[in-house]
Curated annotation (Swiss-Prot):
Pfam families: Proteasome. It comes from Brucella melitensis biotype 1 (strain ATCC 23456 / CCUG 17765 / NCTC 10094 / 16M). This is ATP-dependent protease subunit HslV. Allosterically activated by HslU binding. Its EC number is 3.4.25.2.
Length: 184
């Protein structure tokens, strides 16, 4: 878990759901500086590459943008190979002195795979089609897992999970941004 430094800007909860031919990443819009909400409508989920990859990030905002840019560069180097680009990014992240200090995590997805990327070099795939990161990640993950076997769509599950996380976590708000792709 990322420790909260009161002088660092944080962005918080991201959840991904893969179900019934869709993959969704949803995130809230709150950015906090210590105990203060600095912005309520930040966009922490976006399309990258040629629009065929969606990414969501949690952690220190500037660090997350740095990693997002690096992932886009890896996707240019390894087009249509999200797994390979992600592994190469995490190798750099783990071994580069500058990158190693970055405090952020990312969830990324394309039509074939969903991954969590961490600064410890982990590239993780979800077992049950759901993953979540950030300060409200555990709440969102529990909610999404509880709903994955229902008849709700991937987007409905992601939105409900984010709303539950926002009800519980003070670093997460109800301004939810959702991006989705068709999945295999």
């Amino acid at each position: 878990m990322i420790e909260h430094n009161p002088t660092t800007i944080y962005g918080t909860t991201i959840v991904t759901v893969r179900k019934d031919g869709k993959v969704v990443i949803a995130g809230d819009g709150q950015v906090s500086l210590g105990n203060t909400v600095m912005k309520g409508n930040a966009r922490k989920v976006r399309r990258i590459g040629k629009g065929n990859v969606i990414a969501g990030f949690a952690g220190a905002t500037a660090d997350a943008f740095t990693l997002l840019e690096r992932l886009e560069a890896k996707l240019e180097q390894y087009p249509d190979q999200l797994m390979r680009a992600s592994v190469e990014l995490t190798k750099d992240w783990r071994t580069d002195r500058y990158l190693r200090k970055l405090e952020a995590m990312m969830l990324v997805a394309d039509s074939k795979v969903t991954l969590a990327l961490t600064g410890t070099g982990d590239v993780l795939e979800p077992e049950q089609g759901v993953m979540a990161i950030g300060s409200g990640g555990n709440y969102a993950l529990a909610a999404a897992r509880a709903l994955i076997e229902t008849d709700k769509s991937a987007e409905e599950i992601a939105r409900k999970a984010m709303n539950i996380a926002a009800d519980i976590c003070i670093y997460t708000n109800h301004n939810i941004i959702v991006e989705s792709l068709d999945a295999q």
